[in-house]
Amino acid sequence: KRPSPAERGLEGLDRIYPPSAEFLVRNFIASSLPMPTPRPLSDLPRERYFSDIGWVSLHSALGEPDRDIHITFVSSPYGSFSHSHAHQDAFVLNAFGENLAIASGYREFHNSPHHDQWTRQTKSKNAILIDGIGQKPQDKNATGRITRCQIGNRFVLSSGDATPAYALAQPKGRVKRVTRDLLFVDHRYVVIRDVVALETPGTLSWLLHAENSLDWNPRTQTALIRAAKSTLTTQLVSPDGGKWTGTVSDKFTTPVDPKYSQGNAAASYSSGSKWSEQKHFSAESQKAAKEHLLFAVLWPEPRTPERPLKASWKNGSLEIHRPDGRTDTVRLTDDAVSVQ
């Protein structure tokens, strides 16, 4: 059995987990230094690309949570190893002080069945599955990478390539391309473009998760997330005119340990007496294909929208009738992006 850092003292702190070193730095070095002068968050950039770890953070009103729309998008060269999850090209969206599109699941304790078989897995993220299979978990080679990060007059674009992460979980050579573009338009709403290319036909699942309420309208191809006050409307648009079959579940495929969700530990780890099962949405392609192209338009609102979101495919672009009464034409390809 490896001795704990406390037992080893200062010996070998460069080779083991460093709580002892952190204690020394904090109490005997850093504590004597003055605190930095506070600065308003609004002085910082609204968007930032952390190139070394493959994370992109986008805000509309940084430092004003009641007005802010915040998206985090990840496609990381560090893979899914150790504490990382199988979440390349996944995103979360919080708005107006509430969680809307979440990374679902819990970590009752490290490597619990729920943590290992749900929370670490791609199926717990706002991502995609190929034939019901996500990215390979716990593998440093299951990587992604940010391929574009661009700021335009009316948009911020981030593109990710998660091909290696999906390829490791499929037969060798089957996965040719899995990419996602995330476009933040007017710092107001999001357009997502998913492109998948396979050697043999396969189905695609498009996933979305929420804390409480999530409903699907098959006629309009629209999912609606409701938080305490705010909402997130998501409409799926297939350029080929295909419809998607949506299902909503309120159960984890691997449940939270009952000692934590219902027992004496629940009060210590949750704000309520029982952990929520959360809501899990999956839109399935109705047929297998070698190539898939899917757009999603996500409109967050501090209340229920007064007008519906209506998006359609026309002449190689998305025509988006916004709930605020405006109409945008969005063109998003590998080579070009425009918002008019």
Predicted regions and their residues:
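Carbohydrate-active enzyme catalytic cores, enriched for enzymes
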Residues: 1-100, 151-152, 283, 288-294, ...
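Catalytic Cys-His active-site segments of thiol-dependent hydrolases/isopeptidases
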Residues: 101-106
